[in-house]
Amino acid sequence: MTPAERTVLMVVHTGREEATETARRVQKVLGDNGIALRVLSAEAVDRGPLHLAPDDMRAMGVEIEVVDADPLAARGCELVLVLGGDGTFLRAAELARNADIPVLGVNLGRIGFLAEAEAEAIDKVLEHVVARDYRVENRMTLDVVVRHQGTVSDHGWALNEVSLEKGPRLGVLGVVVEIDGRPVSAFGCDGVLVSTPTGSTAYAFSAGGPVLWPDLEAILVVPNNAHALFGRPMVTSPAATIAIEIEADGHDALVFCDGRREMLIPAGSRIEVKRCDTAVKWARLDSAPFTDRLVRKFRLPVTGWRGN
């Protein structure tokens, strides 16, 4: 079998009922069009629940490669195709970002705000993939650095949000929020979220933050259950640096990047968040306005709208 000139990495939420059927459809259509498929080892038949049967596919002339889910799993691919919900998309976005390629989501979840299409439209999605008929948007990401006792103790990045949270079963977390080197407010809270416009419809929204349109360049700061008169969300410049200092005599805390990558934050630490130089490349098929997506995904009532 001649090696394919094109390869797509498929990342799948194997806990979804329709995952196997949809994945097999992807496998067949890409194979019929001479595009090799790469899958993660945890999702392959011999080591995972997806039952993709790589050996059977190879025997039928379909090129499929099984790789470990390391940070460079998407290197050499042209696209990361996601079958799952927003959690699966965020997991796949990390692989796409590391390889500097686009990520395209097909929703198998409940809301799937980050997905471009639903599972029933998989054939149409694959037509676009085969023809490379999609546009690519650069979505802003955040860089986070943790400093403790004057030295960098940890660092990370996020597409949706950086979430500082108090530890389990601990009391109120005492923090001071600083923007561009100037203190804004000190308060007790359950945590503080720093979000991109992309993440404004996720955890930050649940914590009371506003929805930011994705073409707006800004950073959103949302105190979570703040014990303060001034505990309101703030929208800052995309060039701003947001710092959150934890009381030295207070509790340890945790930072989660996109709800996945976790950092332990000792009391007295300082968390600095700013715009990251490296964006996530987002493959777009849907030309509808963001307003329509918002209404559709959140099932917002629009009865009575008269228009022009």
Curated annotation (Swiss-Prot):
Residue numbers binding NAD(+): 86-87, 91, 160-161, 190, 201-206
Keywords attached to this entry: ATP-binding, Cytoplasm, Kinase, NAD, NADP, Nucleotide-binding, Transferase
Cofactor section: a divalent metal cation
GO biological process entries: NAD metabolic process; NADP biosynthetic process
GO MF entry, a single one: ATP binding
Subcellular location: Cytoplasm
Domain of life: Bacteria
Source organism of the structure: Mycolicibacterium paratuberculosis (strain ATCC BAA-968 / K-10)
Database matches in NCBIfam families: PRK03372.1
Enzyme Commission number(s): 2.7.1.23
SUPFAM superfamilies in alphabetical order: NAD kinase/diacylglycerol kinase-like
Annotated protein name in UniProt: NAD kinase
Record keyword ATP-binding present: yes
Top EC class, one word: transferase
Protein family (similarity comment): Belongs to the NAD kinase family.
This protein's encoding gene: nadK
Catalysed conversion reaction: NAD(+) + ATP = ADP + NADP(+) + H(+)
Gene Ontology CC terms, in alphabetical order: cytoplasm
